[in-house]
C-alpha cells in the first residue's frame, strides 16, 4: 500500500479535456487545424472534411452550384437546418487522492504480534499486567521496525493501548516525558538548528575538511578520535552526540553535498552518521565518566562483590580493546556501507576558499560559539556546581532564544526533535514498567537457573551469560534501566559459576555501553544520530547487529588477552 500511495503521489496527472491535447498540424495547406473537443471526435474525424463541413448537416455537403432537390415551390425556400449542438466537453476525471493513512501490511504485522503474545498463557511467576505490557511493548517494537506510521505515532498508539487495556495508568504511561534524557535529545536538535543557521557549523566543518578532508576515511577518523578525547570530560553521551557532534556532522554532510531527501544521503552522510554513532558507543565504554550509567555499574559492583571499580581500573582495562574497536569499526563500515565520495584531493583547497569567502565570524556566530562553550563547560563541571546536563542545555537554549540566534518558531518547526521526544519517552516508560512489574527479574532468575544447570566451565558459562545480557538489550530503551534490572543478578551468577568476580564486573560494565549500538533507541546517542534521517531503519538495525558481533569478538578476544596480561584473571 505504501508503494501504491507513493506512486500515485509522484506520478504526474493528465487531464482529458481538449486543452491538454497538443494542437494538430493541418492535413493540407488549404485546411485549417482542427481543435477537437474530445477524444471521441478525434477518433471519428474524416481527413477529407474541413472543420466547417465536419459540423454541417449532410445536405450542406453538396456543392454551392447544385440546388438540393425539393418538391416545394422555388419561391418557398427550404427551412433552415436545425442547429447541431456541439458535443459537450469531456470533464477531467477526479484525481485519485493518495492514501494518507497507515501502511496496512506493517500495521497488521504489528497488531498480530501483540495479539498472539497477549493470548499466550501467562508463565508462572509473571503477573498478568507484566505479560500484557510485554505484548504491547513487542507490538510497538515491530511497528517501529516496519513503520506503518511515523515512529512517534506508533509509540503514541502503544501508550494508548496500554492505557486503554488498563495495563498502565495514564500517569504511568506518560511518566517518561518528565525524564531528562528525551528532553536532552530534543534540546540537542535545537542547538543543531542554531549551529547551522548561524553558519558556525559550516565554518567548523570547512576547517575539518581543510585539515582532514582529502579522504572521507580521514575525515571520519578525525571526528571519531575527537569524540573519544571529549568522552572522559563529558559524562553524557547524549550531550556529546547531540550538542557537539551532530551539528558538526550535519554541517560536514551539507558542505560535501550530502543531504536528506534528495538521494544524496549515501554520498557521505549515511556512512558518517553510522560511524559516529557506533564509535560513540565505544568511547562511552572506555571511561568511567564517559556515560551517565557507568557509575551505577561501579556502585552495584561494590555492593555485590565488595570491590569498587576505580577510574584508572576502568580506563586501563578498556584502553586496548577500545582503541582496536575505534580503529576497526569505521574501516569495516567503510567497506560494507561505503560513502560514494571516497577521495577528494581538491577538498582542502576548496574548503580554504570557502573560509576566505565567509570572512570573519558574524555576531550570531560568536554568540553561538560562546553559548556552546558555556554549555559544554557546565557539562564538564556541572557535577561540582550541582547543574545536570539537561539544565545546562536549557540554559544554553535560553541564551540563544533571548539573543534571537534561534527563535521559538524554529524550535517548533523541528519536527524530528518532537517526534524523537515522543517515541523515545514512550519506550522508556514501557521498558521501565516491564522492570517494575517484575518481568525482567523473572527473566534474569530463569536465565540463572538454566545456565547454572548446564555444567559448563566458567569460561563457557560466562560466555552464555554475556550473550544473554548483551542481546536482551533489545527490550531496553536505557542503559541505566538495563544495568539496574540485570547487572546484579548476572554478576552474582557469574561469580557463583567460577568467573573471577572483578573480571565479570568489569566486562558486564563495558557491555552495558556496547549493547547500545544494537538499535536506534538503546543509548542516548542513538536517537540523536538516527533522527538525522540519513540511514534507513533496517540498515541501522542490520549494521548495528553486525558491529555488535565485531565488538564482542574484539572485547572478549583482544580484550581477554589484555586482561590476562594485566592480571584480571
Swiss-Prot record:
Cellular localisation: Plastid, Chloroplast inner membrane
Membrane topology, as annotated: Multi-pass membrane protein
Source taxon at top rank: Eukaryota
Record-level Gene Ontology MF annotations: alpha-ketoglutarate transmembrane transporter activity; malate transmembrane transporter activity; oxaloacetate transmembrane transporter activity
Gene Ontology biological process: alpha-ketoglutarate transport; malate transport
Main location, first listed in the record: plastid
UniProt cross-references to InterPro entries, sorted A to Z: CitT-rel, SLC13A/DASS
NCBIfam families in the cross-refs: dass
Family named by the database record: Belongs to the SLC13A/DASS transporter (TC 2.A.47) family. DIT1 subfamily.
Name under which the protein is recorded: Dicarboxylate transporter 1, chloroplastic
Highest classification ranks of the organism: Eukaryota, Viridiplantae, Streptophyta, Embryophyta, Tracheophyta
